[in-house]
Amino acid sequence: MSKTDVSGNAKKGRKGLIVTVVAIVVIALAGAGFWVWHQQPSFCNAICHKPMDRYVETYESGNSSMLSAVHAKQGKVCLDCHEAKLDDQVAEATAWVSDDFTDPVAENTFQYNESFCLNESCHNMTRDELTESTSNMAFNPHVQQHGDIDCGECHKAHSESVMYCTQCHAEAEVPDGWMSYSDYMSAKQS
């Protein structure tokens, strides 16, 4: 083999290595960019379109009666509450592609219970501290006499929140943008 043959093979080998390294870097950067985009609310309705549009709209709306808008103002994104599990995402993608999804998405597929909401990542307080923080209300919804009520019974993420107290206390003041319990039940049945 002549020197030029060896040198030509070496150049081809280096060129192939450079192309391979560049391809790996481009794929890694594209993957990282996709991962960052995947964590943004805009991803949810850019990919899934119709079933997620209304949820991203409530996130962006600023309507303080919806948890998603309140959380958006605090810098929270969808994946802070909706954990991205691969099996769930594959099932959701399959439902979307096959046009076999519920619209609107079923409301109670996601439970906001005390341990989910009252922790270091979200509302860093105990149940007693929460009860104390709402003690100035005429009907304190967080007192223990009401039993175990999930946070999501009142605080709705993507629809009007519900003043659950009005189920028993019809005279309880309903915050702006919220629904009374009877209005909620009527809307749910229609």
Question: Model-derived features: where do they sit?
Answer:
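Short sequence/structural segments immediately N-terminal
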Residues: 2-190
